[in-house]
């Protein structure tokens, strides 16, 4: 996967017979949960098709062998459904969603139920930080999630800027441990959120938001392959593609930024 592919690859279209969105019901559920628990939801509407396609680039431009994919923060399943459409027999998809209402919607999703034969699917209704504590459940022997599972691709929909810097670092470190050597990670952030957070939530939360953004920029400097701005999304967003060299590395030492770094990331 190259920077050029991520930045300039034309938006692919979802097949006409299966849209990433399941209609107004998903949007209403998403909005209701956003109003109830915005910190964990992080948006008022699911991602649009253009952003979904940017996030699944490592799967649509993939090696010719079975792959294992982890999706974290699936919401109502717009990315999950796209993954289910493009995965092939022998592939495995492990979906992690902490919101019980979203998890229940995913369990009943007809697109996921109609995935290709031979595509393993597992749903974990927990936070990704607690994934190792989840009890094993009987089911399809092709289901992913065995102890020590490492993934070729992780697609993260978590709203990092709603979390503390310590939480974000812990999650990113976990992603590095969960990725196979050379595995790829995608995530996204909305544009213009730093100024908006300062104006709407005050200077203290604005400072926390900026620190999380700086942490993400360090992570991208260490592992980033490219980024892509998606204007056809509400709100506009930027998708990031990263690759793990394998294993944990101290990519973001715990220290204060220099004045030059502070200006560069504000």
Question: Which ranges hold each PLM region?
Answer:
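A short glycine-rich, Lys/Arg-flanked "PGG" loop and its adjoining helix->strand segment in the class I
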Residues: 169-181
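Conserved beta-strand signature within the Rossmann-like core of class I S-adenosyl-L-methionine
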Residues: 181-191
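Class I SAM-dependent methyltransferase Rossmann-like catalytic core
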Residues: 24-63
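S-adenosyl-L-methionine
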Residues: 105-143
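Glycine-rich SAM-binding Motif I of class I
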Residues: 77-81
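Conserved class I S-adenosyl-L-methionine
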Residues: 66-75
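Class I S-adenosyl-L-methionine
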Residues: 206-266
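Conserved SAM/SAH-binding beta-strand->alpha-helix loop
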Residues: 99
